[in-house]
């Protein structure tokens, strides 16, 4: 969004630590802050390569902005153009999926899925083998095979409880209600959903390819989401009017909050 490089200064996030950026669509309020952020990242020293995921046109926008402003970045930028629904990134910690939404320009939602966590270490079972505290216990907890002082080998996987599912965060920006939102939001721990209008403005929301707070709440309810955060609120809803959107959505889905810049929320593991 706009002024990203200014807001990020108020957090403990360092631009050079950011290695991937996901852009939903190319409307100005979602990309005008990108050139400034890229420049700030360069000023802070070499942060290494950066990958930008976004719809067609995002590379042209960035390169033109940097060229016209004669801004030189000190690191390579790779562009991944979003075209098809599905997996777009994966490492050993999490995976990111995308699906096309319904907006005036190509727009995409994102589902971030954390990899499953190892189960809890079964200490009663560990005690039977007199495993000492220290590195060996840590390796066992990580599911690795260890060798005791008497030569006996223990497979860490035999000492762990049931694997715990990772957390899921779904981010939905500019769109009208569409089936793909449900697919991305299904059983998410957190759903961040655009809420440009209140429930009384359903026709206007449809005309301008946006959603209401009630649209977001219905998705959260029907797709068994744990928590819903409303964002992308129209400027007409300031102060108490903004809180009214939250109150309205809670009538359908009680675990709803209005998101503000710099808010911080903990996402707990299930179970």
Question: What is the role of each PLM region?
Answer:
Residues 2-53, 81:
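Active-site metal-binding motif and surrounding structural segment of the metallo-beta-lactamase
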Residues 85, 178-271:
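Binuclear metal-ion centers of metallo-dependent hydrolases, dominated by the metallo-beta-lactamase
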Residues 8, 34-37, 62-65, 181, ...:
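Hydrophobic packing residues within well-ordered alpha-helices of enzyme cores
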Residues 89-98, 269-271:
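Short, surface-exposed amphipathic charged segments that create phosphate/polyanion-binding patches used
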Residues 19-26, 54-55, 170-175, 192-194, ...:
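Active-site neighborhood of phospho(di)ester-bond hydrolases with catalytic His/Asp-centered motifs
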Residues 93-171, 175-184, 190-192:
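Active-site-proximal loop/helix segment associated with metal-binding centers of metalloenzymes
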